[in-house]
Amino acid sequence: MDVLKKTPVREQDPKVRATNFEEVCLGYNREEAMEEASRCINCKNAQCIKGCPVSINIPGFIEKVKNGDVEGAYQVISESSALPAVCGRVCPQESQCEGKCIRGIKGEPVSIGKLERFVADSAREAGIKPQGAEKKNGKKVAVIGSGPAGLTCAGDLARMGYEVTIFEALHEPGGVLVYGIPEVRLPKTKVVAKEIENVKSLGVKIETNVVVGKSVTIDELLEEEGYDAVFIGSGAGLPKFMGIPGEQANGVFSANEYLTRSNLMKAFCEDSNTPIMHGKKVAVVGGGNVAMDAARTALRLGAEVHIVYRRSEEELPARVEEVHHAKEEGIIFDLLTNPVEILEDEKGWVNGIRCIKMELGEPDESGRRRPVEVPGSEFVIDVDTVIMSLGTSPNPLISSTTKGLEINKRKCIIAEEDCGKTTKEGVYAGGDAVTGAATVILAMGAGKTAAKGIDEYLSNK
């Protein structure tokens, strides 16, 4: 065993997985996990914990894995995380916990994410559940949204003894975990549904098909329904577009809609209740994880897929692992390329996308070099479907129906970073509804912070 290198993790063969929706990464078995855990040197001042947005005791759980104590490892993790099987799969560990790992200075960091996944999966298979509160405190909290922020906040509050009800607008709980991330990265029945069951086992109730702002307002929850506090974790589901000619053509989707139709509605299957055509040649505009998810989904539906991104590969915001998997599967990357027009036929259907070549200039406000058009470099990519993956912003329904709840110029709810408190008394918020589109783990961290803020508020009320 070379302690400087990670224990390899098994994956589906790229040629095989490109034709199915089964999970790509197969994870560690017990022997592999214990071998990888033995690489951890159990630092006294563990920087990996500081790199984790929910502050999991990483050396603590890894030590238990090394000793074969899966249940003990799970209880250590579940003290900090309500969704370990999710985080072990989709967190950007390379820039967080693993990015801080001391092992990474002279070799490869410990595979913290893969070990977390192993523990969560093993606990699920053994029927191990997180430990809940011994007794309730008699206070009620409403949580809006059942995505990662809402589930985390609800789980933490339930552990503190609160009676918690989650209100979800869709017919299935899970938020972006269900509609946004494809099965190839995050299985829905085997993983997401079980994680939600674990949160419910803590005493959390979930009501679906409740659109807060229409079905019921926040003021009504506080004044008429008897809730002592409200947490808003409704995410950011309003897609952004470029504003170029042709965006209204048939065959143009936001990534949000495309993935929801595929993941939640199965609309690209012929026997679906809401079937729609899926393209043979698809362009996905954008370079984040959502763009990779949309591209890899389109590939599995039989399309030739192009990722169209205006910067170079170094600036791609997607995880290195996701880019690597996409390339392995045969997705074409048109880098330093920017769309200027979506072309359509006489019936209004997409039949191409006109692009222009770019070069990188001086850094912009994000710190990345600004892309500049190369004059006279326009060309057309032959496609019949265009998926726009340019980010999302919060839906204004909640903010527009709640008196005293202030938003910023980006339409995001204003909340204090250290406690989640909004401008309306008794109302807290976190996740994408506050920050705009970000990662699952950052939303979880915000939900955890807000739970502490709510507990402090109600304890002193």
Can you annotate each of these PLM segments?
Residues 119-135, 192-214, 239-301, 408-418, ...:
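Glycine-rich dinucleotide-binding loop and its adjacent helix/turn
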Residues 140-165, 291-299:
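N-terminal Rossmann-like FAD-binding beta1-loop-alpha1 element of flavoenzymes
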Residues 17-36, 57-89, 106-134, 262-263:
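Ferredoxin-type iron-sulfur electron-transfer modules in oxidoreductases and energy-metabolism complexes
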Residues 42-67, 86-119, 165, 172, ...:
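Iron-sulfur cluster-binding cysteine motifs and their immediate structural context
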Residues 72, 135-136, 140-144, 196-244, ...:
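Feature captures the FAD/FMN-dependent oxidoreductase FAD-binding
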Residues 163-166, 170-201, 206-207, 295-341:
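Rossmann-like dinucleotide-binding cores of NAD(P)H-dependent redox enzymes
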Residues 433-460:
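A conserved FAD-binding loop/helix module that cradles the flavin
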Residues 248-279, 363-437:
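FAD-site-proximal beta/loop scaffold in flavoenzymes
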